[in-house]
Amino acid sequence: MNYTQTLEFLFQSLPVFETQGATAYKPGLERITAFCRHIGNPQRNFFTIHVAGTNGKGSVAHIIASVLQQAGYRTGLFTSPHLQDFRERIRINGVPVSQAFVVDFVEKHRSFFEPLHPSFFELATACLLYTSDAAD
């Protein structure tokens, strides 16, 4: 699959909250926990700042990432939703992951995640965690 086909597959086969609303919501941590275990629990190897709230999360997250980059840290940034391109969600030092990375991630892990039935958000989160080796 190429990048466009990969995104079409993801949007058509996974529940997407931004387009389907509450029907896409999947409570529980079982799927993301299983996915993390499958990819080697990368979340255990880096520090995390979680920004929550009603408004301004994206702006605050970008500011924090920028400050940390200026201090010499290599940062990973995950935001949701994206405006134009899925890769906006996952950035390493301000640069979106490559199209090839997204395609490779989906192809490599598809046989694992299809029977798991993750949400689109859970798959995007796992994709970010998989890039964690590139960040401090």
Named regions from a protein language model:
Residues 105-122:
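ATP-dependent adenylate-handling ligase core
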Residues 41-44, 83, 132:
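Solvent-exposed alpha-helices and their adjacent loops that cap or buttress functional pockets
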Residues 1-53, 60-62, 66-71:
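Short functional linear segments
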Residues 63-108:
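N-terminal phosphate/diphosphate-binding loop that engages ATP/GTP or pyrophosphate donors
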Residues 36-40, 110, 129:
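Generic structural signal for well-ordered alpha-helical scaffold segments
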Residues 130-136:
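Conserved small/polar residues in nucleotide/adenosyl-binding loops
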